[in-house]
UniProtKB/Swiss-Prot annotation:
Name of the featured protein: 3-dehydroquinate dehydratase 2
MF terms in GO: 3-dehydroquinate dehydratase activity
Keyword Amino-acid biosynthesis: yes
Gene Ontology biological-process annotations: amino acid biosynthetic process; aromatic amino acid family biosynthetic process; chorismate biosynthetic process; quinate catabolic process
InterPro entries (UniProt xref): DHquinase_II, DHquinase_II_CS, DHquinase_II_sf
Annotated organism of origin: Bradyrhizobium diazoefficiens (strain JCM 10833 / BCRC 13528 / IAM 13628 / NBRC 14792 / USDA 110)
Binding partners and assembly: Homododecamer.
Record-marked site positions (Transition state stabilizer): R19
Origin organism lineage: Bacteria, Pseudomonadati, Pseudomonadota, Alphaproteobacteria, Hyphomicrobiales
Entry keyword annotation includes Lyase: yes
Catalytic activity: 3-dehydroquinate = 3-dehydroshikimate + H2O
Similarity-based family: Belongs to the type-II 3-dehydroquinase family.
Catalytic residues as annotated in Swiss-Prot or TrEMBL: Y24 (proton acceptor), H101 (proton donor)
EC number, as in UniProt: 4.2.1.10
UniProt: substrate binding residues: N75, H81, D88, I102, S103, R112
Length: 149
């Protein structure tokens, strides 16, 4: 299996650093991408980093990942709580799926406590800020190393 990992970001994450910084922090999505690529290089992972406000684009990237990727690290954002379609797409992916949330969704509004994505995710990281992405990449890399023996 390849060392390719898709890092997928859902709606409004293009506004990271500008939208509700008291919840999501001041780092931008470009900062997150830079950090993911740097860690990926260190861990021997190839990173494909995408963001979309459109559900179908995220689904298309999940379908694309089925053919080539070892893992998906995904912050589905608001689609976490609403998208059976993303869950169905993730259920077609055989690699590792790590769900990431910048904030601790369990300390927030009740509707944020439910995740369709968690029903497929191999792990969920919430409340660690943008470091959650890096933790997710480290987990995928560890599982790949263990699979190699």
């Amino acid at each position: 299996m390849s060392g390719l990992v898709y890092v997928l970001n859902g709606p409004n994450l293009n506004l990271l650093g500008k939208r509700q910084p008291h919840i999501y922090g001041h780092e931008t999505l470009a900062d997150v991408e830079r950090d993911c690529r740097a860690l990926g290089k260190e861990l021997g992972l190839e990173i494909r980093f995408h963001q979309s406000n459109r559900e179908y684009e995220l689904i298309d990237w999940i379908h694309e990942a089925r053919e080539t990727a070892a893992g998906i690290v995904m912050n589905p954002a608001a689609f976490t709580h609403t998208s059976v379609a993303i869950l169905d797409a993730l259920n077609t992916f055989e690699g590792t799926v790590i769900e990431v949330h910048i904030s601790n969704v369990h300390k927030r509004e009740e509707f944020r406590h439910h995740s369709f994505v968690s029903k497929r995710a191999d792990g969920v990281i919430a409340g660690f800020g943008t470091q959650g992405y890096l933790l997710g990449l480290r987990r995928v890399a560890k599982l790949l190393d263990e699979a190699k023996g």
